[in-house]
Amino acid sequence: MTPLSKIEALLFVAGEDGLSLRQLATLLDIPVTALLQQLEKMAQKYERDDNSALSLLESSKTYKLVTKKDYADLLRQYSKTPINQSLSRASLEVLSIIAYKQPITRIEVDNIRGVNSSSAISKLQAFDLIQEAGKKEVLGRPNLYVTSDYFLDYMGINSLEELPDASSIELKDEEFTLFDNKENEEQISENVKEENEN
């Protein structure tokens, strides 16, 4: 493993939240100055590599892997294609957790599910079912996620108060989602289909 490959692996797993310089330096056990040199090498590597769709983004001293702007239209098209209309079990599970626990960070969702949720969160954002709602005032200031107004339309409700009662539901049971009711799951897929046709 090289320093660059280690950084890449960490940033990939961190997903949308990214990692701060301090977090990366601690995880890699290297000085910040040396880390900055490696990050610069990584940025240049991605910029020069036409066979890579990735780019290194730095914002407020937090680093994350993102796709290059050149791929925006392609990814937008992907998010609207029929092949991507059905939400996976993982995405439905994450959406359920966010609906009942919002505002919530990606790490908190991960802790409930026991697995990384970056991909599911990105997909839910692409469908406009969830959105960022500021940052949690803790170390690293991770993004907070909430359901969107569009989510209410998908569920056929006017407010979150109309969601099924979760008082007796243990969300850590990974088999439970809002969409265990097959009718609801079919409805959300149908709504996605109708939206893409409009």
From Swiss-Prot:
The keyword S-adenosyl-L-methionine does not apply. Its main location: cytoplasm. Pfam families: SMC_ScpB. It is found in: Cytoplasm. GO terms for cellular component: cytoplasm. The keyword Cytoplasm applies. GO terms for biological process: cell division; chromosome separation; DNA replication. Keywords: Cell cycle, Cell division, Chromosome partition, Cytoplasm. It comes from the Bacteria. SUPFAM superfamilies: Winged helix' DNA-binding domain. HAMAP family: ScpB. Participates in chromosomal partition during cell division. May act via the formation of a condensin-like complex containing Smc and ScpA that pull DNA away from mid-cell into both cell halves. Homodimer. Homodimerization may be required to stabilize the binding of ScpA to the Smc head domains. Component of a cohesin-like complex composed of ScpA, ScpB and the Smc homodimer, in which ScpA and ScpB bind to the head domain of Smc. The presence of the three proteins is required for the association of the complex with DNA. Belongs to the ScpB family. This is Segregation and condensation protein B.
